[in-house]
Amino acid sequence: MDQKLRSQEEYKKFMISKPKFKICRRLGPGVYDKCQTAKFSAASSKSLPGGKRPKAPTEYGVQLIEKQKIRFSYGLSERQLSNYVKKVSGVKGAGTADKLYERLESRLDNVVYRMGLGSSRRATRQMVSHGHFIVNNHRVTVPSYEVKIGDIIKIREGSKAKKIFENLTEKLKDYTAPTWVSFDLNNMEGRILAKPKNTETFLNINAVLEFYSR
């Protein structure tokens, strides 16, 4: 099979809607929090039907896998991720990979997730969309809203009594947020302390950039 045709076939495979288990098995448990369990590890360690081993992906296939990891991890559409890459590719200075990571991590839905206020990015995306947060005294309902150093994120007064925010003290007692964000339980507000630093070993952002440069 010619390289171009094989690349197209690989791409189509990833466009098929799959249950989360299959997505995690293909892309790795880091994509969804629910896949980071002993049960998933045991199930995913089983060989393919017939004892077959998965074929080693092509270079294009590896790049595609990394792209899909980011898409599913942050809950982005193809267009959204493509636009992020275009924006950082035209920025001079620091490495493009670092800039892309900063943009992704600075999304409000991700920041709320990093503060420990939701069990997943999908959950915090809904929380933001439903208007539960105030950023610098303004209600924000756009999950992709980009926060900056010094921004203050508060739980809206009318939302504090809602079930999703019950027992926050208990939920956060063993949680350690990244060093670039903080959350004050007494005042029910968080703050952006610094730029996000890429400490992820699960994501290969350079491979994603290579995918879009093809």
Regions found by a protein language model. Give the residues of each.
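Ferredoxin-like alpha/beta domains used as RNA- or RNAP-binding modules
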Residues: 2-115, 142-214
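Beta-rich strand-turn-strand
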Residues: 118-121
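Short, well-ordered loop/turn sites that connect or cap secondary structure elements
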Residues: 127-128, 147
